[in-house]
Structure formats: C-alpha cells, structure tokens
C-alpha cells in the first residue's frame, strides 16, 4: 500500500461511532448527569458561599477541571474498550491480517475515541453554561486543549486496551491512577491555595499542567505557565505515540 487507506479508516471509525450511538446512555448521558451534579452541588450551592478564586466565581472556576476529569476518563475508557473487545472476541486477528496498516488502525480507533470525548466535553460545557455563569477568554485555545487532550489520552486508552488481559484491568489504571491524579490536580482548587510544601509536590502531578492550561483558556489565569502546560501535553502525546509504535512493531499482546 502506497497511501493511506481512507476507506478502512472510515469503516473502523464509523463502526466505533455506531457503538457509541448504541450505548448513548452509558457513554454520554450518564457522564453528563454525573458532572452536572458536581456543578449543582459545588458550583451553584456551595460556590455561592465561597470566595472567588483568583477573581473568578467558584462555580465558573471548577468548570475546566470537571470537563477535564470527564475528558480524561472517557477518552481512556472509549479507546481501551474499543481495542480490547476485538481482542476478547478474537476478531483482532482478522483486522491485523487485513490490508490495513497499523497507522490506519490507530488513527481509526483513537480518532473515534477522541471524537466521542470531544463531543462529551462540549455537551458538558453547554450544560455548565446553563448552571453557572461562564465565559471563555480564549476559545481557540480551549478547543485546542480539548482536542489535544482527547487525542493524547485516547492513545493512552488504546495502550491500556492492548495491555489488559481482562475486563477488570480496563478500569485498573483509570480508577487507581487517572482519577486520583485529576482530583488532586486542581480540579476543585488552585494549587496556589496550598501550603508551599504541598504546592511543590503538586507540580509533580502531570494532570496539574493539563487542567491549568485548560483553565487558562477560560479565565486567563493559570497555576503554571501556558507554555509549560502545552509542552507537557505534547510530551504526553509523543510518549504515547512512541509506545503505540513499539506495540505494533513488537506485536505486544496482539499476536498469538
């Protein structure tokens, strides 16, 4: 094959998006309702009794963090299940033996997972705008961070789906690592509110940089520089791309 097989990419992509449509309650409605409850409790109820954070009302302040929380978890979940299920049923071998390159397989699965996550993020954003006062100072960068993060962590989910040898392992890393890092990464607070020691410790949490950059696109303020946030996100992307390339080069947990 001399070029990209767009027909194959489109076929896999459409299949994954169709699965998203069949599981709409679980894939879209449930995360939106769960996040909306955070907005109601922390934003509308508790937020009215709290001081502004860096001049931003608390309800609006937590919006980027909560969107990022859903974006990270759903990107990983969508991509990991998308590639794990063919492994579980054995159809992955038909895919690997078909005239489809590894780049096309990755592009289709990761593209579908990222599309679902971006759609979810935009729906949550629209829901938040109804519940709390909200403004976006840098719409271009907001969309850029949204898409870049969705693609990056869809790659992470793809890796987890290949690595997992059971359904329980699909949730292992998201539950034990991603969710705690997101909650401790400034979703509900600014790390500047922490004592100096814990502020320094927080800088070792990579999710801090993702949330900080995304929050900057909304309010123009951030815990770390926007360049550092963008650099960390791109670093994640490069690392995950390298791991995916290694997986296909070695056939790790793909070849019988």
Predicted region positions:
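Hydrophobic transmembrane alpha-helices and immediately adjacent juxtamembrane helices
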Residues: 1-139, 144-256
């Amino acid at each position: 094959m001399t070029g990209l097989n767009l027909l194959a990419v489109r076929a896999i992509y459409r299949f994954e998006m169709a699965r998203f449509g069949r599981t709409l309650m679980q894939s879209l409605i449930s995360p939106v309702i769960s996040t909306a409850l955070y907005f109601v409790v922390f934003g509308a109820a508790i937020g009215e009794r709290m001081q502004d954070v860096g001049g931003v009302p608390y309800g609006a302040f937590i919006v980027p963090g909560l969107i990022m929380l859903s974006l990270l978890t759903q990107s990983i979940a969508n991509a990991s299940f998308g590639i794990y299920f063919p492994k579980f049923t054995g159809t992955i071998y038909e895919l690997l033996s078909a005239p489809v390159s590894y780049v096309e397989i990755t592009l289709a699965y990761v593209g579908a997972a990222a599309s679902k996550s971006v759609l979810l993020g935009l729906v949550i954003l629209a829901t938040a705008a109804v519940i709390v006062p909200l403004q976006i100072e840098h719409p271009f960068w907001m969309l850029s961070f949204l898409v870049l993060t969705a693609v990056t962590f869809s790659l992470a989910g793809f890796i987890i789906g290949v690595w997992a040898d059971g359904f329980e392992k699909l949730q292992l890393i998201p539950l034990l690592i991603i969710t705690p890092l997101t909650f401790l990464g400034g979703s509900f607070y600014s790390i500047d509110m922490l004592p100096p020691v814990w502020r320094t410790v927080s800088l070792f949490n990579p999710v801090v940089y993702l949330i900080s950059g995304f929050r900057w696109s909304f309010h123009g303020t951030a815990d770390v520089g926007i360049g550092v946030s963008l650099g960390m996100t791109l670093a994640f992307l490069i690392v995950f791309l390298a791991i995916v390339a290694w997986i296909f080069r070695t056939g790790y947990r793909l070849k019988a």
